[in-house]
Amino acid sequence: MQTVHGINFAPFSPRGALAGEAVRDELRRMRRLTGADTVIFCPGAVQATPFTENIDFTGAHTTADEELLAITQAAKDLGLRVFWKPTVNCLDGTWRAHISFFDHDVPCEPKWGPWFDGYTAFQTHFAALAQQAGIELLILGCEMTKTEHREEEWRACISSVRSVYDGAVAYNCDKYGEAFVPWWDAVDVMASSGYYPVDAIGENLDRIRPLVEKAAKPFFFAEAGCMRMRGSAQVPNDWTLQGEPDDEEQNRWYQALFAAMETRPWLRGAALWD
């Protein structure tokens, strides 16, 4: 796998947001200012709460297929590699890592089975579209922490995706979650969200390395980044953090990330969060 110098561009865009010349201007600007060679588009799906079975990937909160195909072609025309990461979010604001149901079925409660049916339909829909678009890497979700122990369902989802898509398949676990995905063998590429404290980036990469070597898979940070706020270098993805803007603190975190990456060639790069 070629090293990724990427950006997650306009993730979870609602219907219409990726259409038109203005967004293409932003894509060109991103390419010019960052030197990125890869862009990740994150078409979204939504469910009402973390305990809701129904997943909607066709409504107003989601990107239309034709928009995604058009912005993908625009990125390719700029010489960018394009990955897709279809991702589900909760409309009530709960982080998707908390999506979960009882591990034993109860008649009057929501269940894993219908939820995974919907999630598999969501991923398989975009897998078929990715095949049409010639997408190099399809990342089957992000930070789905409380679902990851459902090994049988995840393997079935991956199998469904592979039935319509012959490109490489990845999964993006959360920070600190690299050791807890029991089905890494079913994907081609391992990925996680690299939101580690500024003084612990290197030690966490050293923790991850044996897992990657054992799996014999490429690994990269499908997300990484730090807020521009005092205190953010210790909790780089805590969007609730309150404080004064601090460009230097943000810069210090990015410099630490890049320095750690330069001395660890087994890490196949990162895609910064927009």
Where are these regions (language model features)?
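Glycoside hydrolase catalytic-domain groove-lining segments
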Residues: 63-65, 70-71, 77-81, 85, ...
